[in-house]
Amino acid sequence: MRAIAGLSMGGGHTITATINYPEVFGYIGVFSSGIFQPYEDLDGKMLALKASGVKKYWVACGEDDFVMESNKKLLVALDKSGMEYEYYENSGGHSWKNWRIYLSMFSPMLF
């Protein structure tokens, strides 16, 4: 299975790619991002993603990150679909300091 991860806008692209191509990615990392726009049939797409057999869906965001509200929308969508995921929240904001932490935590999960 392939892995995909992204930070900030790249995290948004990760969400879009995985809900539109649910059978492609088995390991998904979303760092400091969330749902910023309405997606057509988000509930159905999330259910299809869940059914595809995702091995790991990992989300992280800093408590002071300006995208926290969008991040919470992603968590609500994941909860609604019943998707299993791990969530990590730490201090700090939208910064490379946090993204280094997130990548160092997520990358070992791929092996």
Give, region by region, the residue ranges found by the protein language model.
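Non-catalytic cap/lid and distal C-terminal segments of serine-dependent acyl enzymes
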Residues: 1-111
